[in-house]
């Protein structure tokens, strides 16, 4: 069953993981299409999943129910390393649903700088009772690569009611979080030394809930020295987490 999902899986990939195919645990049948025409790419999956209705009590409203799933992804390459795209998914089970819509962009600004942006909205009706809820997630990152300076900064904010039944959201993308993580590495190449190069770096993370209460913080400086056949490095990490 897994090869059905694995082929051309990158068609459906976005920075926020909105399709984690192991969420579709017991598919009964489905149709999948991916294709490209020039700068355009398109992918779709129509499938159902028997898992939600299995091994339930006969009085359970979801007994025997199947989740019906539709996924659509489209993108356009606008240069060698730039792309804009969209992602849509709908998972329906019983009287409920989880719908996700996203737009994303990867833009190469010049030879050194690239930015990624994504905005995601979700609309959820619980499968059994409860109130409908909507949520959103936004994230933007900027990256610099070069011989002397490498830099990464990534901001992510996710509201409390954000829900992706088909996705997988790690610590930094989870609902009710707002945070930023940064890394900076400076490379030096001495011309009159036995040292080929040395690198000094710093990594830091701030993660709060949407009310501003600190959840996690990490700070980590590092230093590495490179000789012709040997490297030496030292790192230090200080972190605090509220469970």
For each feature predicted by the language model, list its residue ranges.
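Surface-exposed extracellular loop regions of Gram-negative outer-membrane beta-barrel proteins
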Residues: 69-125, 190, 198-201
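Carboxylate/His-rich catalytic cores and anion/metal-binding grooves
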Residues: 1, 30-71, 232
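Exposed, low-structure sequence patches enriched in small/polar residues
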Residues: 118-243
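Residues that cap or anchor secondary-structure elements
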Residues: 1-35, 44
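Outer-envelope beta-barrel architecture signal
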Residues: 2, 29, 38-41, 80-84, ...
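Residues that define the transmembrane beta-barrel architecture of outer-membrane proteins
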Residues: 25-29, 36, 65-70, 97-101, ...
């Amino acid at each position: 069953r897994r090869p059905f999902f694995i082929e051309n899986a990158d068609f459906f990939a976005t920075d926020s993981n909105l399709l984690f195919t192991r969420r579709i645990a017991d598919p009964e049948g489905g149709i999948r299409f991916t294709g490209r025409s020039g700068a355009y790419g398109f992918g779709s999956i129509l499938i159902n999943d028997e898992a939600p209705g299995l091994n339930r009590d006969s009085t359970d409203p979801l007994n025997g129910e199947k989740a019906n799933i539709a996924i659509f992804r489209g993108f356009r390459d606008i240069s060698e390393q730039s792309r804009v795209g969209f992602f849509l998914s709908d998972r329906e089970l019983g009287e409920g649903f989880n719908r996700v819509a996203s737009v994303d962009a990867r833009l190469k600004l010049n030879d050194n700088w690239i930015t990624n942006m994504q905005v995601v909205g979700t609309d959820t009706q619980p499968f059994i009772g409860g109130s409908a809820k909507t949520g959103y997630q936004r994230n933007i990152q900027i990256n610099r690569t070069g011989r002397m300076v490498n830099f990464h900064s990534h901001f992510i904010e996710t509201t409390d009611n954000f829900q992706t039944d088909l996705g997988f959201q790690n610590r930094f993308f989870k609902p009710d979080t707002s945070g930023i993580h940064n890394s900076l590495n400076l490379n030096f190449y001495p011309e009159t030394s036995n040292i080929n190069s040395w690198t000094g770096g710093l990594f830091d993370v701030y993660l709060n809930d949407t009310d501003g209460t600190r959840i996690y913080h990490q700070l980590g400086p590092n230093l590495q020295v490179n000789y012709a056949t040997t490297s030496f490095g030292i790192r230090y990490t200080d972190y605090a987490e509220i469970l």
